[in-house]
């Protein structure tokens, strides 16, 4: 079975369409999204006239089996994560001023001050509110854990994580799956950590096939226009290998 993972779209409907087309053309039987469907910032992206969060949501609803909530999706939907990573969020968090949020969290969390309004309908917002922060799926005899980032910061809301190597070990202990898939990091290709890498975080370039082992943690590439880093991750459950496919702008 071939499975496609798409992540970190940030309202780039054009690249999402390319990603879905590529996944179907290559024979993906199942498609999953690892979060950050929304979240456009002119500081980080340069396709303001083409951003379309609503179109992205509609495409994912049609083509993806499960979409995971990322930190930007949580912000857009005014949701608080179930996994706070030690941060106390008051119930009126989204009504507080920027400076008050900074004061309460010690500048430890993303506040999204540069993001533009995604102009979503109430139906689209409600859909974002229903997205799971974690999903465990069965595919080709493998149990796979899907999150946007690593426990305890499952949604990826912290500006700086805890200690990712230790957190990944704790993540495995909690969810007990064969593979772990996340997004959030926007790697050039994918990042893998496991026994074969001596638990170091190793980058696997686009187009390079990697044989996975039980317990491996993988980070999929982002799916938004970028000169080097746009693509999808494919998992072949028969050969137990992954391959990242670069998408050209």
Task: For every predicted segment, state its role.
Residues 1-4, 136-145, 211-218:
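Beta-strand-turn-beta hairpins that frame and shape the catalytic cleft
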Residues 6, 11-107, 111-112, 129:
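Core catalytic region of metal-dependent phosphoesterases/phosphodiesterases
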Residues 6-7, 31-36, 66-71, 146-147, ...:
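Active-site neighborhood of phospho(di)ester-bond hydrolases with catalytic His/Asp-centered motifs
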Residues 10-14, 39-41, 72-79, 152-153, ...:
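Active-site environment of divalent metal-dependent phosphoester hydrolases
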Residues 26-27, 114-194:
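His/acidic metal-ligating clusters that form di-metal
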Residues 101-119, 210-216:
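Intrinsically disordered, low-complexity acidic Ser/Thr-rich regulatory segments
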Residues 161-241:
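Conserved beta-sheet core of the metallophosphoesterase superfamily
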Residues 244-249:
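Short, solvent-exposed aromatic-acidic interface loops
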